[in-house]
Amino acid sequence: MLSAALRLTAKRNVRSLATASSSSYPGALLNVPKTQVTRLPNGLTVATESNPALATATVGVWIDSGSRAETKANNGVAHFLEHISFKGTKQRTQSGLEIEIENMGGHLNAYTSREQTVYYAKLFSQDVAKGVNILGDILQNSTLDPGAIDRERAVILREAEEVDKQVEEVVFDHLHAAAFPENALGYTILGPKENIQTLSQADLQAYIKNNYTADRMVVVGAGNVDHAELCKLAETNFGKLPQGSGKAKFVRPAFTGSDVRIRVDDMPTAHIALAVEGASWTSADHWPLLVASAMIGSYDRAAGNAHPSSKLAQIVAKHNLANSFTSFNTTYSDTGLWGIYIQSNNRDNLDDLAHFTVREWMRLATAPSEGEVAIAKQQLKTSLLLALDGTTPVAEEIGRQMLAYGRRLSPFEIDRLVDAVTVEDVKRVANEFIYDRDLAIVAVGPVECLPDYNRIRSAMNLLRY
């Protein structure tokens, strides 16, 4: 429970924030440029947020397909394709493509996630037409040269080695595999080494045919980009894309309570992730779970925050239980993961760390306070708005939301959705998703003192603990 002083401070802060919200703050959100959306005859969607005052723009293609659209046999093909797409097209050699981008002063990039693949360019507004042409070319006309494919294997294998050195990446890959076994959502994005060594031109071509269709793509523009002009460019450069069979259909994965531990006693830091099943993008519980995650908050000893706002952060700081922790709410089209990622050098007190973490989770279901919820909502709204600083983050949000919701949620609408979350909403979702629910545990490093699965699981019910 918050101390009396903290409760008083919270109430004062909430009153002052409410006063600010009632005047200029909502008005500023309403002044954000409207997102314009057009669907072309072949099913391709074009979405833009135009700001003519800027000199730059981000244009990109968001594709409703990632590693979740793969099988065990071709796991890694989406990421492999992202690499090989930049190795030359029927019109442009690899060096010609690189020189063209360099001469514009632009940046061409791509990334693959579990449910989406993204190709985008950051450039001056006068080069938007060139950027869209390049994106259309690499997505539809890549040569997929067998020699380039073989050369790229070594690059991706080195990338996989680097990923394996990043413990956080390893933990979250294991977390997905443990929580969603025998489902493509549990696959890694890079795929196993065996697949990287054997994926062929035919595998890449089949993936393109099945997934790179107009109805699964959104062409996005943010910054100094004209919507009508981008629609014309999309029609010219993507108008011949086949329509496809509609949105990808996945089997909803069954969340599995599980425990994966990789004990390495000579590592200095224990890395631990605890997660329960979360909600999908479109679930009404998505926003209360985000607020609940913000209430658990984050902590970093190196940041030197003497007065952390979350109760768990206060406990961890007081007893030196962890170097850092971050609560997370990872969302997918039909499920999610809600949990916490912790790093700790205090290997002998991991039992206390697990105890206080789960205790705070249980408190969300039994006794969250008005002050805590109000502060968490303000922090969440701030973080969501600060994440939109620049044309590329705006483009990413537009693309992600168009694929997830079929529309863009404006900053004002998101602000209202967060604001509408009540203490009772937090208690309800905590009881539904967290209290007495199975959880997935992944721990890497010196984790001998972390309690076993059954002990942590029993603490998820206050009557049994």
UniProtKB/Swiss-Prot annotation:
Binds 1 zinc ion per subunit. SUPFAM superfamilies: LuxS/MPP-like metallohydrolase. Heterodimer of an alpha subunit and a beta subunit subunits, forming the mitochondrial processing protease (MPP) in which the alpha subunit is involved in substrate recognition and binding and the beta subunit is the catalytic subunit. The active site is at E82 (proton acceptor). GO terms for molecular function: metal ion binding; metalloendopeptidase activity. The gene is MPP1. Catalytic subunit of the essential mitochondrial processing protease (MPP), which cleaves the mitochondrial sequence off newly imported precursors proteins. Preferentially, cleaves after an arginine at position P2. This is Mitochondrial-processing peptidase subunit beta. It comes from Blastocladiella emersonii (Aquatic fungus). Keywords: Hydrolase, Metal-binding, Metalloprotease, Mitochondrion, Protease, Transit peptide, Zinc. It catalyses: Release of N-terminal transit peptides from precursor proteins imported into the mitochondrion, typically with Arg in position P2. Belongs to the peptidase M16 family. InterPro entries: Metalloenz_LuxS/M16, MPP/UQCRC_Complex, Pept_M16_N, Peptidase_M16_C. Pfam families: Peptidase_M16 (PF00675), Peptidase_M16_C (PF05193). Its EC number is 3.4.24.64. It is found in: Mitochondrion matrix. Binding to the alpha subunit is required for catalytic activity. One of its GO terms (cellular component) is mitochondrial matrix. GO terms for biological process: protein processing involved in protein targeting to mitochondrion. Zn(2+) binds at H79, H83, E159. Its cofactor is Zn(2+).
